[in-house]
Amino acid sequence: LPLGKVLNPLLRVLIGAMTGLEKGSMKEAAYYKETTAFVNYLKVGGNFTNIAITGHSLGGGLALITGAQSHIKAVGLSAPNTVLGRSTVDPEITLEELERYTFNIAPDRDIFPMIGDPSRFTENIACNSQNFFSCHDAGRSLCEMLYSCGGLVMRPVFCECFSMFGYPAPETPGNGTFTFSEACNI
């Protein structure tokens, strides 16, 4: 948040006070308890050996809380950060648990990942839109990750990345059987 270093100590106090006031009603709306219980059920069942959870926006926040509480890998896309609110959940989450089990992807100009303090493993990605709502779009974020993490040639870009968000079309490899334009019916 703007002036985060100045306002965050005050936010911690406000979050603590609000949690104390709303403790009873928060139990009824604590979706993270359901997701954490479900993941723990899967872990105990023994049928799954490698469980991970992911989510976008508020679902990403739930994924981060569940991952830290259940000790599984969790990835949030455009999720609000959980460092400031980690003491408001039951059981509380330590900073070490957040840093060991969670990863948040934060697009430029997306307001949701600006909420709270980021944990150590937050990856900032570009967003070339001036509209912050567009920067919250999961499809745009996926295109940015494919574009920036792919190679210069043969990067795996969806047709929508080119047509909807203006990413350059990938080059066809020398032995390619069809062009990007042919594959996307452009």
Where are these regions (language model features)?
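Gly/Ala-rich beta-loop-alpha elbow adjacent to hydrolase catalytic centers
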Residues: 54-59, 63
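A conserved cap/lid and substrate-binding interface adjacent to the catalytic center
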Residues: 1-50
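Residues that line or immediately flank small-molecule/substrate-binding pockets and catalytic motifs
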Residues: 55, 78-79
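Short, hydrophobic alpha-helix immediately C-terminal to the catalytic nucleophile
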Residues: 64-68
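Serine hydrolase/lipase
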Residues: 72, 79-186
